[in-house]
A protein has these predicted regions:
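Short acidic, glycine/serine/threonine-rich loops at helix termini
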Residues: 75-80, 119-122, 230-232, 255-261, ...
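Extended active-site and interfacial segments that coordinate phosphate-rich ligands
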Residues: 15-16, 121-128, 132-134, 224, ...
C-alpha cells in the first residue's frame, strides 16, 4: 500500500497563491528599478539605415537608449534546449535587420514607464523597406532573403540553406512508399493546414535584473529554463556563465512559450551595461506579438490500407512556417514523426518530411504538444477518412493497427521498443464512456441542429531520450525535515507537489516534512527545465533515486547510534527502532546529533538520471458536438478522454492536466488563430481579437485513466502534460463531418468554413 503515490493531494503552494501572497516575478521588482521599453519595427522586413536618438535622450529621466550599434555582435539562439541545441544561432540582442512587425529596434531605459513612452516617439529611424516573405509556398527562393547575414551558426546540420530561406529540411523514409501504395486496396489523401496558435499564458513575459555585490548579473524571470537562459545570456554578452545567475519565482503559465528566452537577454544587457537594476515587462500586445507561437504547417498526406484493414503506408510531407527565427523549428517538426507514425504499426513503408522556411512572421517556438499536435491532426483525420472509405468503424480500424507493448516502430531507434502501454484498454474505456457502440455517430437534434461523434488517438513522449538529464539533491536539515533541490520549473501544473510525493514515498515521511527549492542556477543542480513532458518521468525518477540514497544513509546513521547492523533497523520515515524494540529514536532527534562534533556529517542524497527511451503516454478521445445548420457554428457538448500515463502519481493534478490540455485543443480546433494582414502585421494581437475558449465554450469534460506500468520510470510513471492537447482537433473535425458532412481541413474550424463545406442536404 502506497503512502503518497496515487493520492490526490492539493498543490503544496495552493494556499499561498489563493491568498495573494507575493509569488510572481512582478511582485519582487526592486523599487528603484529602471524601466525598459522596446521600440519596435512597423515593417515586416527592413534594414535600418540610421537611428537618431538625440532628441529622445534629452527627455528628463531617460537613463539610456541602446540600438544595434551598442550591443555585442554575437549571434545566439533563444531556444531552451540542451547544448548543443539544433536551433540556429540567428539572433542578436538588437539587429540592423528587422524581420517581423514588432521586432526590436531600440531599448529605451528610463526612471519610469511614462518617461520611456514619452521618449520613444522622438527616436527617428530610417528604414530600407524590403518585400516581406508572407506566403510559405513562395518563401523558398523568394527575392527577399530573411537572413542575409553570413554569421549564422549551427551546432548540427539540419538541412539548412539560409540564402534560399530554408532553415530546416528533413525527410525520413523507410520502405518504398509508391510500390506499397500500389498494392493497397484503399488510399486516402489530402491537404491539411494547422494554424499558428498562441500559448496565451495569463502572466505576460517579464524579467528584472541587477548586478550583485560580487559583480555578477542576476536575472529574475518568468522562465521554464533557468540554466539554458544563463547559457544564452553568457554567450550574448560575451561573459563567463559564472558571471550570470538566473532564478525564477512562480510562473503564471508557460505552455512552452517560456521555453524560449524572451525578455531576459535584453534585461541582462541593460543591467550589465548600466550596473543598475532594471525591469522589462511586456504588455499583452507585446506578449502576443513578440514572443513565439506554435508553428503553422501545411500537410500533404497519403494513407493506404489493404482490404483486410491493415494500414500499410503512411506518407506525410509538410512545409513549416518558422517565422523570423528558427527557434525550435527542427525539433518541433521532427518530433511529430516519433509521436504520430508509431501509432499504426502494421505499416511497411513510411515517409515523413518537412521544409521549414523563414518568413516575416512572429517566430515559431515551443507549444504544448511540440510537433505531435501538428502531425496527429492530418494523420488522425486521414485515418477517419480511411475508415469511412472502407465502411468500417474507425475505432475498429485503429485497434487492428495499433502498436502493442514490446513492439518496435519503423521510426524507432534500433534499441527502442514500446515498453509499456495498455492502449487497447484505453480505447475500450473511452468507447464505454461515450457509449460509442450503443448509439449513432450522427443524429438530428432538432430542425436547426445536428449532432455528431468523432474519435482520435494520440501519443507523446516523456522527456528527450539520450539527451536531457535531471539532477536532484535532497538534504536532511538540522531539524529533521528535508529540502529537495531541483532545476525543474513549477509553472502551475503541480510539479513540486509530484516531486514531493515521489521523494516522501521513498523516505516514508509525511509530505509536510519536505520543502522544494527550485530554479536558481546558484543553488540547485542542473536540470534542463520543465519541457518535453519530462518533469515526472525524468526529474521524478532522479528525485526517487536521490531519496533512496538518502534513506540508506539515514538508516546507516541510526544503526551507528543504536550500535547495531543496518539490517536490524526499521525506519518508517519518522521513527527508527531496532527489530526487538529495545532502542528507538525519531528523525528529529537524529538530525541535530549528526551536525555536532568532529565527525559531523549533513546527510544528503544526490542523483542524476536520463533515459535511453522516451516512453509514450497514450490518449484516446471522443468528441461530441452539435452543429448549427443555419450558420455552421460548432458547439462542443462533451469531450471524453482516457489516458494511459503509466502510474498516476496524483490523480487530482493529472485530471487538471487533461482538462487544461483539452480546453486548449478545443480552442485550437474552433476559435484561435494567429492571423496576419497583407503587410505582415499581426491582427489578433490582444485578447479581444485572439479568442481563447471560456468555460461556456467547451461543453462537459469527462476524464479517466488506464494505468500501465512503465519499467523505466519512477514508480512506473510516464508523462501526461502534453499528450492531452493532441486529440482535440481531429476528434472534433470527425464529429463535425459525421454531423453535417463538412470535411474541414484547415484550422480553426470557424462557422464560415463549416457552413461552406456542409453537405447541401443539411443546410437550412
Amino acid at each position: 500500500m502506497k503512502q503518497h503515490i496515487g493520492k490526490a493531494y492539493d498543490k503544496v503552494d495552493s494556499k499561498g497563491i489563493l491568498t495573494g501572497k507575493p509569488s510572481y516575478t512582478g511582485d519582487f521588482v526592486p523599487k528603484d528599478a529602471l524601466v525598459i521599453k522596446v521600440l519596435r519595427s512597423p515593417h515586416a522586413q527592413a534594414r535600418i539605415k540610421s537611428i537618431d536618438t538625440s532628441k529622445a535622450k534629452l527627455i528628463p529621466g531617460v537613463e539610456a537608449i541602446f540600438t544595434h550599434e551598442d550591443v555585442p555582435n554575437t549571434r545566439f539562439t533563444l531556444a531552451g534546449q540542451t547544448y548543443p541545441e539544433p536551433s540556429a544561432y540567428d539572433a542578436l540582442i538588437l539587429d540592423p535587420v528587422v524581420r517581423y512587425v514588432g521586432d526590436e529596434v531600440a531599448l529605451v531605459v528610463a526612471k519610469d514607464e511614462a518617461t520611456a513612452l514619452k521618449a520613444m516617439p522622438l527616436i527617428k529611424v530610417e528604414y530600407e523597406v524590403q518585400k516581406p516573405v508572407l506566403d510559405m509556398h513562395t518563401a523558398i527562393d523568394h527575392e527577399t532573403v530573411v537572413h542575409p547575414e553570413d554569421d549564422i551558426h549551427n551546432n548540427i546540420p539540419v538541412g539548412q540553406d539560409y540564402k534560399r530561406n530554408i532553415c530546416v529540411s528533413y525527410h525520413k523514409r523507410v520502405g518504398d512508399v509508391e510500390a506499397e501504395l500500389a498494392k493497397c486496396d484503399y488510399v486516402v489523401d489530402g491537404t491539411y493546414f494547422d494554424q499558428a496558435t498562441r500559448q496565451t499564458a495569463m502572466e505576460p513575459f517579464q524579467s528584472f535584473g541587477y548586478v550583485d555585490a560580487l559583480g555578477r548579473v542576476v536575472i529574475v524571470s518568468s522562465t521554464q529554463i533557468v540554466f539554458h537562459v544563463r547559457r544564452h545570456i553568457a554567450r550574448a554578452l560575451g561573459i563567463p556563465a559564472t558571471k550570470v545567475r538566473v532564478l525564477k519565482p512562480r510562473i503564471g503559465g508557460g505552455f512552452g512559450s517560456k521555453q524560449t528566452a524572451c525578455t531576459e537577454i535584453m534585461t541582462a544587457f541593460v543591467a550589465w551595461t548600466l550596473k543598475k537594476p532594471c525591469y522589462l515587462l511586456y504588455d499583452r500586445t507585446e506578449s502576443q506579438t513578440c514572443s513565439t507561437t506554435r508553428h503553422a504547417r501545411e500537410w500533404k498526406i497519403r494513407v493506404g490500407a489493404t482490404k483486410d484493414g491493415l494500414i500499410k503506408v503512411i506518407d506525410m510531407d509538410s512545409i513549416t512556417d518558422a517565422g523570423a527565427h528558427a527557434t525550435h523549428c527542427f525539433t518541433t517538426t521532427t518530433a511529430g514523426e516519433h509521436k504520430s507514425i508509431p501509432l499504426y504499426n502494421k505499416a511497411t513503408a513510411i515517409h515523413y518530411g518537412t521544409e521549414g522556411v523563414y518568413m516575416n512572421h512572429t517566430p515559431g517556438g515551443a507549444f504544448r504538444g511540440y510537433g505531435a499536435t501538428e502531425a496527429l491532426w492530418p494523420l488522425e483525420c486521414a485515418v477517419n477518412n480511411l475508415a469511412d472509405k472502407m465502411g468500417v468503424d474507425p475505432a475498429e480500424l485503429r485497434q487492428k493497427n495499433l502498436i502493442a507493448q514490446g513492439e518496435q516502430s519503423l521510426v524507432y531507434a534500433p534499441d527502442e521498443y514500446l515498453d509499456s502501454g495498455l492502449f487497447q484498454d484505453t480505447i475500450n474505456r473511452v468507447k464505454e464512456m461515450a457509449r460509442w457502440d450503443e448509439r449513432p455517430h450522427s443524429w438530428d437534434i432538432d430542425e436547426r441542429y445536428r449532432g455528431g461523434l468523432g474519435m482520435a488517438l494520440a501519443l507523446q513522449g516523456s522527456g528527450v531520450a539520450n539527451i536531457d538529464v535531471a539532477s536532484v539533491e535532497i538534504r536532511l536539515g538540522d531539524d529533521g525535515n528535508y529540502t529537495l533541490y531541483t532545476g525543474s520549473s513549477e509553472m502551475g501544473m503541480g510539479s513540486n507537489t509530484v516531486l514531493t510525493q515521489m521523494a516522501c514515498e521513498v523516505i516514508g515521511c509525511p509530505m509536510e516534512y519536505m520543502t522544494v527549492v527550485e530554479s536558481d542556477t546558484d543553488i540547485v543542480p542542473f536540470d534542463p527545465g520543465s519541457y518535453a513532458s519530462s518533469t515526472t518521468y525524468v526529474t521524478g525518477t532522479a528525485a526517487k533515486m536521490a531519496a533512496e540514497e538518502l534513506r540508506t544513509k539515514i538508516i546507516a546513521k541510526f544503526a551507528e547510534f543504536f550500535e547495531t547492523d543496518v539490517e536490524n533497523v526499521e525506519f518508517d520515515g519518522v521513527v527508527a527502532t531496532t527489530k526487538d524494540g529495545s532502542k528507538t529514536m525519531d528523525i528529529h532527534q537524529l538530525a541535530p546529533k549528526l551536525l555536532v562534533g568532529v565527525k559531523a556529517e549533513q546527510l544528503s542524497g544526490f542523483a542524476t538520471w536520463g533515459s535511453h527511451t522516451s516512453p509514450p503516454p497514450f490518449m484516446a478521445s471522443i468528441a461530441e458536438v452539435k452543429v448549427d445548420k443555419q450558420t455552421g457554428k460548432v458547439i462542443p457538448l462533451h469531450f471524453y478522454s482516457c489516458i494511459d500515463c503509466g502510474t498516476v502519481i496524483n490523480p487530482k493534478l493529472a485530471r487538471v492536466q487533461v482538462e487544461g490540455g483539452v480546453v486548449q485543443a478545443i480552442g485550437m480546433a474552433l476559435y484561435e488563430d494567429v492571423r496576419y494582414s497583407n503587410n505582415g502585421r499581426l491582427e489578433t494581437n490582444n485578447l479581444m481579437t485572439y479568442k481563447i475558449p471560456t468555460r461556456q465554450d467547451i461543453g462537459e469534460l469527462h476524464t479517466d485513466f488506464v494505468e500501465s506500468y512503465e519499467p523505466t520510470g519512477g514508480f512506473g510513471a510516464k508523462s501526461i502534460g502534453e499528450v492531452v492537447i493532441n486529440t482535440g482537433c481531429p476528434a472534433i473535425q470527425h464529429a463535425i463531418k459525421n454531423a453535417v458532412g463538412a470535411d474541414v481541413r484547415t484550422l480553426p474550424m470557424i462557422p464560415e468554413k463549416v457552413f461552406m463545406a456542409m453537405d447541401e442536404k443539411y443546410k437550412v
